[in-house]
């Protein structure tokens, strides 16, 4: 590429890090790292009404958890928060006012509402109509004096070139253009409180920080022509733009909504449940991009090497919770036991299950976990007297030979001394029951598994029985025999 790559992630500190914003950050990160460019973070905190205490820290903390790093941010650079840059915005507001490219607007909110209602009744497209239209200089001066005397604080509006065409070649969407006459008239670049509006401030920031490429969600497409107007008014070259497609719910086919309860949507939720950050990073990287081929498990280094902006999808990205859970399970299965056990400790401790067998339990159930917090429901059988059964499990336990199998295996366990009760000696006892009773296959193994664990599927049965313990296993079998005899 001919110019230095400088990209940014610019969140508003208005809450937790959402999966959509995390994707924006991640794609900018991958793009910068792939091309040897600069990835920076800027905080857009001019919307004071939506400002959340600790929102900035939460954003940065969760990005770090995902495994991202950055080259510039408010932590290392001054004036990387918009609230620290008000003097800079004012400088360019004053310049545009002096050049006649912007003007002070004294229209009240009540007048704007009334005009919108009139336009609606008349079937007109809603738009702001310049309040000075048709006024002479004397009338304009008198109008301003009257409004200021009434204590009305003005906004500042950009004078829109309604005959202008604002177009760009989008990195994802291809050629896009808007007519200046279709964006709603002259728009506010500075609010009454002196703060700039988003579409003005972001241009000043991106130019000042020499941003080369703006990669963001396609909900920003409608903002782009307004931003191009500011670039034009100030005589600056605009960066390249790329607008990623929406993330949709794979079950509903609609835009992912914070009201969708079937998906976890905030990075904090994944942290709390014990997902591995590498798994979440991998999953998000494939939301609207793929490197080609059938492989889906990639390390961060592989994703950086493979990332190609030309493969950003033009179709909506489906958020599939089941796919994420499959991917997470793959990462947990392949992680070392020490890592997963350390992650599991807080869950085990809170449940009162951090016993001397805890690490063995984690090792036993690690291949089944989609998130580490699942260690609690997975190990319920070790801390209860009688496991609850599903209808399918109850049906198995109504089999004619079930009592025979359970009585025979209980007798084998009772006959084992403590020093003989080890994992490798348990399977031979099950085979001995087969030899004595002539019962084999599912009719042999399934009743024992369900009686001991309350599950039709799970880890190796001898491992489960050993960790449950001889006495507890016998107790579970006795409880099951009582249950099926009712």
From Swiss-Prot:
Keywords: Aminoacyl-tRNA synthetase, ATP-binding, Cytoplasm, Ligase, Nucleotide-binding, Protein biosynthesis. It is an enzyme of class 6 (ligase). ATP binds at residue 258. Signal peptide: none annotated. GO terms for cellular component: cytosol. Monomer. This is Glutamate--tRNA ligase.
